Regions:
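Histidine-centered metal-chelating micro-motifs
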Residues: 97, 118, 137, 142-148
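A short glycine-rich, His/Asp/Glu-containing loop-to-beta-strand
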Residues: 74-95
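A short beta-strand-loop-beta hairpin characteristic of the jelly-roll/cupin
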Residues: 111-132
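Short, conserved beta-strand element in jelly-roll/cupin
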Residues: 92-93, 102-118
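Short glycine/proline-enriched turns and hinge-like loops at secondary-structure junctions
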Residues: 101-104, 123, 149-152
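A short hydrophobic beta-strand segment most commonly corresponding to one strand
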Residues: 108-111, 136-138, 152-163
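Non-heme Fe(II)/2-oxoglutarate
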Residues: 1-80
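Residues that flank catalytic or metal-binding motifs in active/ligand-binding sites
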Residues: 86, 104-106, 154
């Protein structure tokens, strides 16, 4: 089955190509599995935890989270900049399901580690599967959505806001 076909109603599409092995190597060099999220971009003087969770906790607007937290991730930071992402973070999802919600902006998703048969996103009434590949996915997360991991393994991906 080809999981990479674009949605017919633009809930998601492949928006770019990357060297996923390079990104994976960089991400795995800094990842800490004690966290569910690690910021890749924050505000000036922010750390890898300043910006996680609900934005209402922070005084800054989402678009101000644009300073790389890990300068050593040169290729990953270059991709984030090229795709005009902000408030980008590593998501580490254990077995479970996120709440049904809508975000204020669309999101870019770059899968790093996933079980394509047991991890999927639901946007409105459409199931979306994003395999680990060179593909980068734009997803209209302003629509109601959730993410599900039924695997016993963590799912790791990069997610970032775009306007």
């Amino acid at each position: 089955m080809d999981y990479r076909a674009a949605s017919s109603n633009k809930r998601y599409y492949v928006c770019s190509k990357v060297d996923i092995e390079f990104i994976k190597d960089e991400v795995l060099s800094i990842i800490d599995y004690d966290y569910q999220q690690m910021m890749l971009q924050s505000v000036p003087n922010g750390d890898h935890q300043y910006g996680v969770g609900r934005l209402e906790k922070y005084k800054e607007s989402e678009d101000l989270f644009c300073v790389p937290v890990f300068p050593e991730l040169r290729y990953t930071n270059e991709i984030i900049k090229r795709l005009r992402m902000y408030r980008s973070r590593i998501m580490i999802m254990k077995n479970g399901c996120y709440s049904w919600h809508a975000d204020s902006t669309p999101r870019i998703h770059i899968p790093i580690i996933t079980d394509i048969d047991k991890c999927f996103m639901v946007v409105e009434d459409e199931v979306i599967r994003m395999p680990v590949s060179e593909d980068v996915y734009w997803v209209d997360t302003t629509r109601e959505h959730t993410f599900v991991n039924t695997s016993n393994d963590n799912r790791v991906h990069i997610v970032g806001c775009v306007s």
